[in-house]
């Protein structure tokens, strides 16, 4: 979908660039495929802020997305494409031959009326899901499982995709958008195609209020806080923080690698931090 630019009839519209969503369905979602969504304001069950700069925003209903694609060997048809306020990608409403309906992530080039299926072997068409071991090398995929049956976890944001670059000893070799090369079990499911809405990264909100509508609050720097709030806080006048950049809890930030899952290190063939390690 194209980008929309606006005439600067107000200051907030001067730099406004939005994705044109005129082709999407304009009604409400299927009620049985949604559930209520309670706002947390970034607080956990103790009431403490664990995710800063969140709160407010328009009321939403959560759309239940089928990341597992467990409806095997039953053909479905794309009923409509919809906007989902809970994610950057668009979603597609699928109606199966037996009458059941589900939402899936909409890949690029998926059109209303297209047929999709989840099967052990299927055509290499956007929206079809199958195990990685049965896909040809070079296929562009998204919504990739990391454990068989767990549901897709990799390449789910707008415009994202992974590429199958090889198969060996029961594992599939994937190249991710980050540059990482990793192994995934061949039995894991993936969906053909790249995720929809690739122009999401080119959007410009134009004004702070549009960010607030999305539930994002102002991102305050640590150096302008008080010492009680942040290690960089305090000082008379403007200061630089006086130490290497750290998080509010004193851990190094700006590039410090924190990965500690040694069990799966053997599945990462090339780290996405390769250039950083050479420094």
Swiss-Prot record:
A biological-process GO annotation: cytoplasmic translation
Family, similarity comment: Belongs to the universal ribosomal protein uL2 family.
Organism superkingdom: Bacteria
Biased composition (Basic residues): 270-279
GO molecular function terms listed in the Swiss-Prot or TrEMBL record: rRNA binding; structural constituent of ribosome; transferase activity
This protein's GO CC annotations: large ribosomal subunit
InterPro entries registered for this protein in UniProt: NA-bd_OB-fold, Rib_uL2_dom2, Ribosomal_uL2, Ribosomal_uL2_bac/org-type, Ribosomal_uL2_C, Ribosomal_uL2_CS, Ribosomal_uL2_dom3, Ribosomal_uL2_RNA-bd_dom
Function: One of the primary rRNA binding proteins. Required for association of the 30S and 50S subunits to form the 70S ribosome, for tRNA binding and peptide bond formation. It has been suggested to have peptidyltransferase activity; this is somewhat controversial. Makes several contacts with the 16S rRNA in the 70S ribosome.
Species of origin: Rhodospirillum rubrum (strain ATCC 11170 / ATH 1.1.1 / DSM 467 / LMG 4362 / NCIMB 8255 / S1)
Name assigned to this protein: Large ribosomal subunit protein uL2
SS bond partners: none
Annotated keywords: Ribonucleoprotein, Ribosomal protein, RNA-binding, rRNA-binding
Location of the region described as Disordered in the Swiss-Prot/TrEMBL record: 223-279
Claim: Nuclease is one of the keywords in the record: no
The protein's assembly and partners: Part of the 50S ribosomal subunit. Forms a bridge to the 30S subunit in the 70S ribosome.
């Amino acid at each position: 979908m194209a980008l929309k630019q606006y005439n600067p009839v107000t200051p907030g519209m001067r730099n406004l660039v939005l994705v044109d969503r005129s082709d999407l369905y304009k009604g409400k979602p299927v009620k049985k495929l949604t559930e209520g969504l309670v706002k947390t304001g970034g607080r956990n069950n103790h009431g403490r802020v664990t995710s800063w700069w969140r709160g407010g925003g328009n009321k939403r209903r959560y759309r239940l997305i089928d990341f597992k694609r467990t409806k095997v060997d039953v053909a479905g048809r794309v009923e409509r494409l919809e906007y989902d306020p809970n994610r950057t990608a668009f979603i597609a409403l699928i109606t199966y031959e037996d009458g059941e309906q589900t939402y899936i992530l909409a890949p690029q080039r998926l059109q209303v009326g297209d047929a999709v299926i989840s099967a052990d072997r299927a055509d290499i068409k956007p929206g079809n899901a199958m195990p990685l071991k049965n896909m040809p090398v070079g296929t562009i995929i998204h919504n990739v499982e990391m454990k068989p049956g767990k549901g897709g976890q990799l390449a789910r944001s707008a415009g994202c995709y992974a590429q199958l670059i090889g198969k060996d000893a029961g594992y599939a070799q994937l190249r991710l958008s980050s540059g990482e090369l990793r192994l995934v079990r061949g039995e894991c499911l993936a969906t053909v195609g790249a995720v929809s809405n690739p122009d999401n990264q080119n959007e410009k909100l134009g004004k702070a209020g549009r960010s607030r509508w999305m539930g994002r609050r102002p991102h305050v720097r640590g150096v302008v806080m008080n010492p009680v709030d942040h290690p960089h806080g305090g000082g008379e006048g403007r200061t630089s923080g006086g130490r290497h950049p750290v998080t509010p809890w004193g851990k190094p930030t700006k590039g410090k690698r924190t990965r500690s899952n040694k069990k799966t290190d053997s599945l990462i063939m090339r780290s996405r931090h390769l250039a950083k390690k050479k420094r």
